[in-house]
UniProtKB/Swiss-Prot annotation:
UniProt KW keywords: Developmental protein, Differentiation, DNA-binding, Neurogenesis, Nucleus, Repressor, Transcription, Transcription regulation
Residues covered by the bHLH domain: 16-72
Pfam family, one: HLH
Gene: HES5
Localization terms from the record: Nucleus
Alphabetized PROSITE patterns for the sequence: BHLH, ORANGE
Record protein name field: Transcription factor HES-5
InterPro entries associated with the record: bHLH_dom (IPR011598), HES_HEY (IPR050370), HLH_DNA-bd_sf (IPR036638), Orange_dom (IPR003650)
Keyword DNA-binding: yes
GO biological process: astrocyte differentiation; BMP signaling pathway; brain development; camera-type eye development; cartilage development; cell adhesion; cell maturation; central nervous system myelination
Motif (WRPW motif): 163-166
SUPFAM superfamilies named among the record's database cross-references: HLH, helix-loop-helix DNA-binding domain
Subunit structure: Transcription repression requires formation of a complex with a corepressor protein of the Groucho/TLE family.
Domain Orange stretches: 88-119
Length: 166
């Protein structure tokens, strides 16, 4: 039996807190140092541009991170707020590109062709709040590859609709 285990069990709560405090403080400092090191790695190019051959102190790293975040925030604000429709269109386009890329990687099947044909149609716009003006038209989906377009057109059968579980 280790003597330190017995000694800790016999200590009062106040004495346990006194012993635990330096350990907790060291863990806190380690977390801070780790986070500062991660910031340094993330902003490495920014540091090289502003201070090429200097040893960076923790304060320098934090100042540079704050400066970078302020600049990023100002850049986003200058770009202007996005509308709900714009967000929806961008998300739809990204999802469409991912789905088409996945579908064209595998051997063609009837269901795959129907999906590709379905993706050719423009997306339905989301319901916009009353205070936000609606865009005049939905952004068309990005052009599909020639292979996907040809396969979708060949597989389309007007008499048979696409099955949906809803």
């Amino acid at each position: 039996m280790a003597p330190s285990t017995v000694a800790v069990e016999l200590l009062s709560p106040k004495e346990k807190n006194r012993l635990r405090k330096p350990v907790v403080e060291k863990m806190r400092r380690d977390r801070i140092n780790s986070s500062i090191e991660q910031l340094k790695l993330l902003l490495e190019q920014e540091f090289a541009r502003h201070q090429p051959n200097s040893k960076l102190e923790k304060a320098d790293i934090l100042e540079m991170a704050v400066s970078y975040l302020k600049h990023s925030k100002a850049f986003v604000a200058a770009a202007g707020p996005k509308s709900l429709h714009q967000d929806y269109s961008e998300g739809y386009s990204w999802c469409l590109q991912e789905a088409v890329q996945f579908l064209t990687l595998h051997a063609a099947s009837d269901t795959q062709m129907k999906l590709l044909y379905h993706f050719q149609r423009p997306p339905a716009a989301p319901a916009a709040p009353a205070k936000e003006p609606k865009a005049p038209g939905a952004a068309p989906p990005p052009a599909l590859s020639a292979k996907a377009t040809a396969a979708a057109a060949a597989a389309h059968q007007p008499a048979c609709g696409l099955w949906r579980p809803w």
